[in-house]
């Protein structure tokens, strides 16, 4: 449709620098951006003279439409953001509905027992044109959501975590539940907070 669109399918519309690793071996620095709606990572090799660049609305030079390629969708590839140091990789997940699939996850904390990730998930709602003057036209809208996933490090799958304390029993090992309760109570952690979840997982990785 030709209605205006609010929001973006991208985590960040601008291309930023990230180092790409294959089986922990560096393949070099690339410009990348993550289309979280399609769950696709677009990459461009800096200095590639065949790539056409255009000026965006902010005056930045960015690769023209169709000039980027997709990062290979294999689990051995990890992309590390040069600015934040945060890793992005393809991981097998069970989502909120229990369905098994692969998705790009951002690593928040990692250690000997658990890895904590978040997924930047994007929903799209089509706008509606006003049929009369009593009703307002609503634009198309992209909305971003943050979902947490926890992987036991002896398993391949990262499990969806709702953020509710009672649901920790579905993502943690039985023997760690008591320790988790003690950490949450002792440090007054909120399990829906990214910062507090990082503290919890780092504590559980000390055991």
Positions of the model-derived regions?
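Sec-dependent signal peptide cleavage junction
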Residues: 1-10
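Long, compositionally biased interface segments
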Residues: 159-207
């Amino acid at each position: 449709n030709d209605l205006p669109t609010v929001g973006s399918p991208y985590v960040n519309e601008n291309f930023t620098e990230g180092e790409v690793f294959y089986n922990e071996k560096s393949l070099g620095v690339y410009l990348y951006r993550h289309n979280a709606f399609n769950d696709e990572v677009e990459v461009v090799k800096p200095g590639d003279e065949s790539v056409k660049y255009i000026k965006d609305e902010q005056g930045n030079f960015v690769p023209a439409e169709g000039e980027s390629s997709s990062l290979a969708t294999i689990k051995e590839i990890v992309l590390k953001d040069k600015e934040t140091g945060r890793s992005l990789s393809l991981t097998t997940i069970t989502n909120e509905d229990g369905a098994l699939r692969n998705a790009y996850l951002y690593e928040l904390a990692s250690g000997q027992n658990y890895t904590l990730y978040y997924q930047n998930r994007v929903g799209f709602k089509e706008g509606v044109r006003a049929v009369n003057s009593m009703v307002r036209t609503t634009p198309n809208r992209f909305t971003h959501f943050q979902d947490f996933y926890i992987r036991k490090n002896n398993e391949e799958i990262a499990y969806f975590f709702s953020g509710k304390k009672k649901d920790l029993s579905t993502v943690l090992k039985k023997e760690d539940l008591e320790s988790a309760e003690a950490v949450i109570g002792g440090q007054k952690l909120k399990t829906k907070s990214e910062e507090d979840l990082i503290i919890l997982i780092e504590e559980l990785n000390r055991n």
